[in-house]
Amino acid sequence: MDKTMDKTAVLDLSEALSRADGDQELYLTLAGIFLEESPKEAAAARAALERQDGTGLAAAAHKLKGSVIQMCAPRLLESAKRLEELGRRGELAEASLVCADVETCLAEVHAALRELITGGFPS
């Protein structure tokens, strides 16, 4: 992926603005909170996975999923949902692969949000 990431490939900005009642500043404020909090949620999921704690993994993935919904990041949302399901079922070997995907998607979302915060919404 090149350095000028297409934010629309990672974020559904139309849906994001709809959820924020068209308020770009509100969305950007929520994005700032997401940038601070989501690494903690992802780290909690990874820690639960390392402890082989399916219940803890499901809880951490569920919390991350709730945050992701507000950002309208569809690929990350699907990965977080899958991680939660695998944690609930105790399928931790597969969950390890999905957790890595969540971490990759999260990094992409963070990059897109930082670009959005500094460069603004596309016109």
Regions found by a protein language model. Give the residues of each.
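Two-component system phosphorelay core
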Residues: 1-123
